[in-house]
Amino acid sequence: MTATTAQLLTETTPWLRLSEHSEEIDRSHLRALFASDPDRVDEFTVTAGDLHIDYSKHLITRRTRELLLDLARSVDVEGNRDAMLHGEHINTTENRAVLHTALRLPRDASLSVDGQDIVTDVHETLEKMGVFTERLRDGRWRGATGKKITTVVNIGIGGSDLGPVMVYRALRHYADAGISLRFVSNLDPADLTDNLRGLDPAATLFIVTSKTFSTLETLTNATAARRWLVSALGEDAVTKHFVAVSTNAQPVAEFGIAPENIFGFWDWVGGRYSVGSAIGLSVMAAIGRERFTELLDGFHTIDEHFRTAPPESNAPLLLGMLGVWYSSFRGAQSRAVLPYSNDLVRFPAYLQQLTMESNGKSVHTDGSPVRCDTGEIFWGEPGTNGQHAFFQLLHQGTRLVPADFIGFAQSTDDLPTMSGTGSMHDLLMANFFAQSKVLAFGKTRKEIAAESASADLIPHKVMPGNRPSTTILAPRLTPSTLGQLIALYEHQVFVQGVVWGIDSFDQWGVELGKVQALALAPAVAGEAAPCTGDTSTDALIRTYRRLRHP
């Protein structure tokens, strides 16, 4: 990605024009914008794959969109997009290509990186995953005692956990082979203990996911899980109950995992973009090769849309630029992600890593400091739970929080309402539409007074509206539509990184804490006196030791 070096980004003409235009928008209200433009909904609605995306309830006009696209052109978003898709080393701080999009290319595609045909590599790995998971699902792969595997425990952290957890939770209705998944990520021993409780070691398979096979949390949990298994079944059982997703064969072999049970991936796939790689092995075990392929096809649908759609109808480009609009020009610090599907309960957490680890940067790619806010803070809960938790702030609070509403026309599980004649899903979606409507248009003092409300209560009941939101509708939550949703957000993050001139594909900010934790471990364990170099940490460690061993 290219940072603006000759001229500060915030001093460029497109940026300054948007700053001036933002002052004009201050004088606008969505009520007036809709009233003055009967074509507004059609003008600000796009389709990408199976996703119907209405962004008409945003604090924008046609002029806003024009200026945002001018800014995108000025930093060459399209050229940077093409560089990414062609395998150029756009991750400049690590000198790597960024090719999560290659994970979902069809078999007959052609793409080489550094002289290597990576499409062939990808499909060889997918084939190996498919063969393995088919054996697991149909019972040809048996545990050490001859039992069929009924539980797969994925041990990983970060992208090796958040993606598989989210996808499995979203698509568990497609798990049709009697295999359930559990996920262990946290260094807190309660995580592993809770997930092992009630399991039969003879019917349990562990997938250890770590690129280097040295990640502290993952290897600590994997070692504890190994002890649990060996205590029940003996040392020889390890090869039948552990497989690895890693690129480091030697420590994997030393752990006791057979070479043929190692599934590799590549340094051009970042962890937070890796669920379509062998990192998704546990998901494929649950839902099967065919459904996993549908997930990849969904990703590819949006990849192609992003690559080919013109700017005015390019959903990831438009939504990414809206994120820039609110973050850099409108003072918004966060975005609420509100899936009206309980199956997407982990989707906001997944997006937190995707956007915050990618764009939580304060220097440009050339090392110069960024002069504007970067990195949207994502948060949210499924509807209607969120309505009874934090929607009060969205409707009447002082903070500007753009929201994404995600809903589906068909439910994976529908039940009748209290009357026995209606649909619970229809009632859920009535709430879905109502919330975005009230956020946008609110309720005026005059409208409340007309209802004979107490004069003292009128100010408390006023709903100001003018709160922006995107509505994303799809026919049904399927592997394909889930892949489309994920890719829609992936490419938004990319667009924003290009505009801000930052490297969206490194994560140096997480490294120092790991180093410091290892340095502090002896003092925390009581093997050395606290001498960390700062008095607060030393005092806290001493207090911890006193409380731990009273």
Curated annotation (Swiss-Prot):
Which superkingdom, per the lineage?
Bacteria
- Keyword Cytoplasm in record: yes
Which EC number(s) does the record attach to this protein? Answer: 5.3.1.9
UniProt keyword terms in alphabetical order: Cytoplasm, Gluconeogenesis, Glycolysis, Isomerase, Plasmid
Report the active site residues.
357, 388, 514
User: Molecular function (GO) terms listed?
Assistant: carbohydrate derivative binding; glucose-6-phosphate isomerase activity; monosaccharide binding
Q: Which Pfam families match?
A: PGI (PF00342)
UniProt cross-references to InterPro entries, sorted A to Z: G6P_Isomerase (IPR001672), G6P_Isomerase_C (IPR023096), Phosphoglucose_isomerase_CS (IPR018189), SIS_dom_sf (IPR046348), SIS_PGI_1 (IPR035476), SIS_PGI_2 (IPR035482)
A GO CC annotation given for this chain: cytosol
- What's the catalysed reaction? alpha-D-glucose 6-phosphate = beta-D-fructose 6-phosphate
Give the UniProt subcellular location, in the record's own words: Cytoplasm
Instruction: State the pathway, as annotated in the record.
Output: Carbohydrate biosynthesis; gluconeogenesis; Carbohydrate degradation; glycolysis; D-glyceraldehyde 3-phosphate and glycerone phosphate from D-glucose: step 2/4
Major location category of this protein: cytoplasm
Q: Which GO terms describe its biological process?
A: gluconeogenesis; glucose 6-phosphate metabolic process; glycolytic process
NCBIfam families of this UniProt entry? PRK00179.1 (NF001211)
**Its family?**
Belongs to the GPI family.
Record function comment: Catalyzes the reversible isomerization of glucose-6-phosphate to fructose-6-phosphate.
What is the protein name given in its UniProt record? Glucose-6-phosphate isomerase 3
**What is the protein's species of origin?**
Rhodococcus jostii (strain RHA1)
